[in-house]
Amino acid sequence: MKFSEEKNVSNNPTNFEGGLDSRKVGQNRRALGVINQNLVVEGRPYPCVVNKRALSERNDVCEKKQADPVHRPITRRFAAKIASTKTSNAEGTTKRSNLAKSSSNGFGDFIFVDDEHKPVEDQPVPMALEQTEPMHSESDQMEEVEMEDIMEEPVMDIDTPDANDPLAVAEYIEDLYSYYRKVESTSCVSPNYMAQQFDINERMRAILVDWLIEVHDKFDLMHETLFLTVNLIDRFLEKQSVVRKKLQLVGLVAMLLACKYEEVSVPVVGDLILISDRAYTRKEVLEMEKVMVNALKFNISVPTAYVFMRRFLKAAQADRKLELLAFFLIELSLVEYAMLKFSPSQLAAAAVYTAQCTMYGVKQWSKTCEWHTNYSEDQLLECSSLMVDFHKKAGTGKLTGAHRKYCTSKFSYTAKCEPASFLLENEL
């Protein structure tokens, strides 16, 4: 009871009226109010100021804000306020430290850290930096795979653009050329058949073919007519012995048969007699025609080098210049007896390959060409080297019919191209 009375006296100053005691109590109440303002945070509201400090310094600042203990009488109410203030400060510090650890890059709670004063252990490691090395290694592997894919040259489908062309027969074209390769051996002759001829030789054959190239150009005939003409001559001479004075007649009749088979408008017999300087009569021409078709057993239609040339030029995506150059090289080969050892498909492939090397100045043979020709680059080098040699000598000597033909504007002066001499150097 005595303690409660003292409490009521200290807390209720209105019980005292004036005097020294009342002044002392009033001064004590003002002093307690000042102390409460210094210790209790819940007093006067302050403006929100955001300072950039390190997390370690922030804890020090919070500790410094706690005022030194004041020696004063403590009531129950004041003690409860001090205890609650310490508890709230401790909980706030714990929450801020946990928040800084969990989300160091978050801006929702306005925690700003100065990089200059930030300790090394407080710096978060970005995820991008942690995965830098694996990402680089994976990208390098991807680049290596992509480079390998680039190096692997794909085989192009050359028949898709002609799918809607009924004359191209794109759906049967592979079967057709597969058949041509099987039967092309029937159009080949023995490379030494001239040995059984007693009155003619290789040189005479070359003169005849060179003259027929000029006649072919004079009548403006198609390419396939010339190739079939030379094939008929060789196949006939392999089976039949011919005297020297009848050799030109064999050439005229072979061209007549080829024109009947390939051309829309066939030259008349009188024109052929006239171009031969009337060396033969009409009767002799018709008689030799009967002899030739019987010797060949009427087997006129055979795959020549021209048949394969059209396909291989398409595989090479040849333009007009490359096409003319390839035909120039293969017509030079028609004159040479030594080229009979090569099959028609190999001659055509070698002509396309040599023409590409001549145009580009380097060896050029794509996977598409190799696929459609069935010949690798190594398989064509021997034939190609001979063609380059013929090209170098085309403008010299007496047999220059093909060179003069391809030196005109009609054939874009193709014969004036520099030969691919580097193919001969590689052979050496």
From Swiss-Prot:
Pfam families hit by this protein: Cyclin_C, Cyclin_N
InterPro entries in the cross-refs: Cyclin, Cyclin-like_dom, Cyclin-like_sf, Cyclin_A/B-like, Cyclin_C-dom, Cyclin_N, Cyclins_cyclin-box
Tagged with keyword Acetylation: no
Keywords: Cell cycle, Cell division, Cyclin, Mitosis
SUPFAM superfamilies tied to this protein: Cyclin-like
One Gene Ontology molecular-function label: cyclin-dependent protein serine/threonine kinase regulator activity
Keyword Cell cycle: yes
Domain of life: Eukaryota
GO terms, biological process: cell division; mitotic cell cycle phase transition
Region annotated Disordered, chain positions: 1-22
Chain's role: Essential for the control of the cell cycle at the G2/M (mitosis) transition.
Protein family per UniProt: Belongs to the cyclin family. Cyclin AB subfamily.
Oligomeric and partner information: Interacts with the CDC2 protein kinase to form a serine/threonine kinase holoenzyme complex also known as maturation promoting factor (MPF). The cyclin subunit imparts substrate specificity to the complex.
Name the record gives this protein: G2/mitotic-specific cyclin-1
